[in-house]
Amino acid sequence: MDAAAELTLLEACWRTVVLGIVQGLTEFLPISSTAHLKVVPVLAGWGDPGVAVTAVIQLGSIAAVIGYFRSDLLQVCRGLARALREGDWGSPDARLGIAIAVGTLPVVVAGLLIKLFWPGYETSPLRSVASIGIVSIVMALLLALAERLGQRRKQLPSVQGLDGVVVGLAQALAIIPGVSRSGSTLTASLLFGWQRSDAARFSFLLGIPAITLAGLVELKGAFAEGSVYGPLPMLLGILSAAVVSWLAIAWLLKFLQTNSTWPFVIYRLVFGVVLLALVLANPTLG
């Protein structure tokens, strides 16, 4: 990555706004925000912004999803509070809260293990352009399989704790760049019979704790001495991610009410093939 001294404030702001737009467009669509936040800067000649910077920009996305689903979250909190008081753990709101809680555990455990035992993760081959291309193709094929085999009967009010475990394990796979958190959770949900729009809704709600924790854990690292981006550029990146994320959430929920996920399957296949072709043409891209 460029040294901090080589960037003017305007250049740093421009880069983080672009990263925020990319983050907002790709966080909630099943196409991998991590992959695009890695690939777009590399193709632009900026270098990999790193895990810390991208995790902090994700805070804009989490602000958007909390704002968008604020009424759902309030209902879940009320359902859990009522369950604690009255023992009514069978209500839809309480069950959804439990599913979100248990579904968050796998990604938290995976993140802690990587933090403790894989200090070189940020520069590992998994973050290479070639690896992201391969993973994107694999995930496209899995989403195609889910779209083909899924029965699409299950709705959000029928969610159980086991759903949280299954989809949460899929979410943990998104630590691998190119997998896509929303893509892996949507794929798992469809395979287990969820309706498309309800699967997306659960994916969004399940992602709130995971994305928030990732952003907070990396917050210190993003502003560490020697970081390319300072507070103002990072703030602009967060704001642009928030606005675009809100629009992406609203669009995807409406889109999946009447459409399939095949456009995302095709996009991910093309994206992966293009990345591999670029690496073959220019091996320095990695």
Curated annotation (Swiss-Prot):
The chain crosses the membrane at residues 17-37, 49-69, 98-118, 126-146, 159-179, 204-224, 232-252, 261-281. It is an enzyme of class 3 (hydrolase). One of its GO terms (cellular component) is plasma membrane. It catalyses: di-trans,octa-cis-undecaprenyl diphosphate + H2O = di-trans,octa-cis-undecaprenyl phosphate + phosphate + H(+). It holds the Pfam family BacA. GO terms for molecular function: undecaprenyl-diphosphatase activity. Keywords: Antibiotic resistance, Cell inner membrane, Cell membrane, Cell shape, Cell wall biogenesis/degradation, Hydrolase, Membrane, Peptidoglycan synthesis, Transmembrane, Transmembrane helix. One of its GO terms (biological process) is cell wall organization. InterPro entries: UppP. Its EC number is 3.6.1.27. It is a multi-pass membrane protein. Disulfide bonds: none annotated. Bacitracin is thought to be involved in the inhibition of peptidoglycan synthesis by sequestering undecaprenyl diphosphate, thereby reducing the pool of lipid carrier available. Catalyzes the dephosphorylation of undecaprenyl diphosphate (UPP). Confers resistance to bacitracin. PANTHER family: UNDECAPRENYL-DIPHOSPHATASE. Belongs to the UppP family. This is Undecaprenyl-diphosphatase. It comes from Synechococcus sp. (strain RCC307).
